[in-house]
Amino acid sequence: DPSFSQLCDAMAAKNADEAFRAAHTLKGVSKNLSLTGLAYSTSNLTEALRGKTELTDDIDPLFKKVKKDYALTMACIQML
């Protein structure tokens, strides 16, 4: 699923609308796969981005948490 890389690209481009879409997609994928930690952090990021036209200061810590949870999730999957 390309949604994490799309989220990273959107955040780098400071595109709040694209970041919202990518975070929302990643949230859905995470929930469908029962990846609870990642689903929780992406849900928080999605709600913070909802309706935003630009990225605000509160977004960066939430995005950092998503990146951390994504890395942890991928590491766990690779151990299987």
For every predicted segment, state its role:
Residues 1-5, 23, 42, 59:
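Residue-level signal for cytosolic alpha-helical hairpin/rod architecture
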Residues 29-80:
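Amphipathic, coiled-coil-like alpha-helical segments
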Residues 1-14, 74-80:
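Generic hydrophobic segment detector
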Residues 7-19, 33, 52-57:
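Short helix-adjacent coil turns
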